[in-house]
Amino acid sequence: MVSVKYVPSDLLINYVSEKLKSEKKIAEPDWSKYVKTGISREKSPVNRDWIYVRAAAMLRKLYINGYLGISRMSSEYGGKVDRGSKRYHAAQGSRSIIRYLFHELEKAGYVQKTPKGRSLSPQGMSLLDNASKDIIKQLAEKDPAFQKFI
């Protein structure tokens, strides 16, 4: 059995984001073209499909950590604020984006609420497990060193 931990994160996130986009279970909001992803950012994201990439990355973080709340997830996507000549300070990412994506992922059936925060549902686990299995198969065709994971 291939775990998400053994698959390169960039390949997994891109694969899952394409899958989420093709399924059309997550609605891309109108404001996603104009919004910054946190107070520490100066510009909006360059990638037009950033909302699906963020959703896939959130699913991966939930898989690895078990459960996360909105505040802790926003600190995962935070950064440091450039305050000119003064010292940098830590800042959280946008909680409204995370809240929106949690609601959309709950509607799609990939995330469920728990008393400790949000966690992956069995459907979300299956999505990530199948994606990691497909990626390892693709990597094994190119490099025989990945055969041991199949």
UniProtKB/Swiss-Prot annotation:
Q: Kindly list the GO CC terms recorded for this protein.
A: cytosolic small ribosomal subunit
Q: Offer an example of a GO molecular function term for this protein.
A: structural constituent of ribosome
Keywords, A to Z, come to:
Ribonucleoprotein, Ribosomal protein
Which residues, by range, are in coiled-coil regions?
none
Alphabetical list of InterPro entries matching this protein: Ribosomal_eS19, Ribosomal_eS19_archaeal, WH-like_DNA-bd_sf, WH_DNA-bd_sf
GO BP, one annotated term: ribosomal small subunit assembly
Gene3D superfamilies to which the protein is assigned, alphabetical: Winged helix-like DNA-binding domain superfamily/Winged helix DNA-binding domain
Keyword Ribonucleoprotein in record: yes
Biological function: May be involved in maturation of the 30S ribosomal subunit.
Its quaternary organisation is:
Part of the 30S ribosomal subunit.
**Family note:** Belongs to the eukaryotic ribosomal protein eS19 family.
Q: What is this protein called?
A: Small ribosomal subunit protein eS19
Organism in which the protein naturally occurs? Thermoplasma acidophilum (strain ATCC 25905 / DSM 1728 / JCM 9062 / NBRC 15155 / AMRC-C165)
